[in-house]
Amino acid sequence: MDDSVFISYCVVTGSFLGFQLLFSIISPRTFTKYSSTYRQLSFGKQCEWDSRCVSTTHALVVGSGCLYILAYDEAVNADPIWGDPFWVKMNVAITCGYLVHDLLLLARFWKVMRDPYMVCHHLAVFYSYGYVLNRGVLPYFANFRLISELSTPFVNQRWFFDVIGKPRSSWPVLLNGLAMALVFFIVRIAVIPSYYSQVFATFGTEGYIRLGIGPQVAWIVSCVVLDILNVFWMYKIARGFYKVVKAKPDGKPRRNHAD
């Protein structure tokens, strides 16, 4: 195992432990002390609250790193398949640590937090990012996929609004819903044509051939699975926002899976 791979797995471990600490100690103690709403929640809802705090923290850290790499990492942008992947690997390692934490959390509290779509999402990400960590390949495309995390804080915020009892017809909820739909569309849906045009542009190149069949299959299969899920979630978000906008002021729209 070379030094860069060893460092990557150290970051994965540190990331997992850090997010576990945030979930198990920092979040529950903080909100138990300062939030009366949190104290009144059931154990299952408190777990989901803490989980969404972890999710938002991960999204902000990794999303910011992605934007920095996209703007300033010339080596990765110049060679999307074999460019120097160090900072991308660090960002991916943080994400992998978070995914381990989240999968274990889902397994532990499956009856409360049941979400098979999220399990499929996490496994597809693991499948492809394993090659990034171990071989340092496809850094540009790995970073491009991680930008989608920028939509996560808005999704979580909608859940928090629901839990604290904010009416879905209130302006804070409507503005967050609009921002969520727009950001989700921009970072997960609108980029699909551009992303695949760049993918197809690499086909047949020397760099693509050097990858070998394993990374090639992992790259394409995981991308297709993730984009199917993203389109499905975008439909749910758009439908939910439409129902809220069309509902009467005192109406209570039904919840949907995108919640």
Curated annotation (Swiss-Prot):
Instruction: Give the UniProt subcellular location, in the record's own words.
Output: Membrane
Q: Name one Pfam family in it.
A: TRAM_LAG1_CLN8
GO cellular component term, pick one = membrane
Membrane topology summary? Multi-pass membrane protein
Q: Which InterPro entries match?
A: TLC-dom, TLCD
Judging by the UniProt lineage, the source's domain of life is: Eukaryota
According to the record, the segments passing through the membrane are 6-26, 53-73, 86-106, 117-133, 172-192, 213-233
What keywords tag this UniProt record? Membrane, Transmembrane, Transmembrane helix
Domain annotation TLC: ranges: 44-246
Please indicate if the UniProt record lists Membrane as a keyword. Answer: yes
Q: Which family does it belong to?
A: Belongs to the TLCD4 family.
What protein name does the entry list? TLC domain-containing protein 4
Annotated source species:
Xenopus tropicalis (Western clawed frog)
